[in-house]
């Protein structure tokens, strides 16, 4: 609410970008720790798309990839994150949705499952696993303009859901603590959590009353901070 694994020659390991640019800086992006939700059974690696699947939602924007620091950690849907599985992170598409992702420039396309929340950097809309990033030519460049098409989802996209606000990253933990205390006094029905990212920096997550989307959107409008603020779906 604001992140890498036999061939003939060693493979160069690029680093995820921190900005949506042609030549991203050589350092991994900072992403917050995955949401601590209850453990769920691991789902099969195979992603099956019904032949009659219709596109339920479209979005175009910048995608990056993540992995360093998050391998074998719990993702937002409760699974253990694996950089070699075809998964991705999105801030608002329901978890476990099946999504087709197309590189606008190269026309390369893959199907992934949304298992995590993010990215929490600028105007990016999607964070890909390393495996998915390789197939979309995102791995080498760090970012790419992509088109997202939701093909299957376990819950409605436009209505319902459980929502929160994520703020960060704070390089000084004291700044995060001060804002946490301020928000706690102002929104007594909300729960404010403070946590650290594996890549560094502190984050705040504000759980609004009844996990209501409109309450979360209002909180974003009413809160003044230099840190980035993100509307995040929890389920």
Give the residues covered by each predicted segment.
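Extracytoplasmic
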Residues: 171-235
């Amino acid at each position: 609410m604001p992140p890498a694994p036999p061939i003939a020659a060693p493979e160069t390991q690029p680093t995820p970008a921190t900005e949506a640019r042609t030549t991203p800086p050589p350092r991994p992006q900072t992403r917050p720790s995955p949401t601590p939700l209850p453990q769920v059974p691991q789902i099969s690696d195979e992603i099956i798309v019904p032949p009659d699947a219709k596109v339920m939602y479209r979005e175009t924007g910048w995608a990056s990839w993540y992995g360093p620091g998050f391998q074998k950690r719990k993702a937002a849907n409760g699974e253990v994150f694996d950089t070699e599985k075809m998964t991705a992170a999105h801030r608002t598409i329901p978890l476990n949705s099946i999504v087709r992702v197309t590189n606008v420039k190269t026309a390369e396309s893959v199907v992934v499952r949304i298992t995590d929340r993010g990215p929490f950097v600028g105007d990016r809309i999607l964070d890909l696993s390393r495996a998915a990033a390789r197939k979309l030519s995102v791995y080498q460049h760090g970012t790419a303009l992509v088109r997202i098409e939701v093909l299957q989802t376990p819950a409605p996209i436009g209505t319902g859901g459980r929502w929160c606000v994520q703020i960060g990253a704070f390089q000084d933990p004291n700044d995060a603590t001060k804002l946490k205390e301020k928000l706690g006094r102002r929104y007594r029905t909300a729960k404010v959590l403070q946590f650290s990212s594996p890549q560094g920096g502190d984050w705040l997550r504000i759980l609004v009353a009844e996990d209501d989307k409109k309450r979360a959107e209002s909180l974003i409008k009413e809160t003044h901070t230099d840190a980035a603020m993100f509307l995040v779906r929890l389920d």
